[in-house]
Amino acid sequence: MSDSLKAEIKKLSARAMQAKMDLHDLSEELPINWERILEVAQCAYEAFGALERKRAELKQTVS
C-alpha cells in the first residue's frame, strides 16, 4: 500500500511544484494578468494541501 501512496505523493508533488511555478511566473508578469491572482493562488493552495494530506496519510501508514 505504501508504494501506491508514494506514487500518489510523487504525482501530487509534481502538481504542487507546477502550481508554485505558475504562481511565480504570474508574479513576475504583474501587473499583466493581475485578475488571475486568486485563481492561480487557489490552485497552488489546493495542490499543496492535497500533497500535505497524502504525506500525513503515508506517515500514519508507516507508523
Where are these regions (language model features)?
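N-terminal acidic leader/helix
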Residues: 1-30
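Short, charge-rich amphipathic interface segments used for partner binding and complex assembly
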Residues: 25-62
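Short intrinsically disordered terminal tails
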Residues: 1-3, 60-63
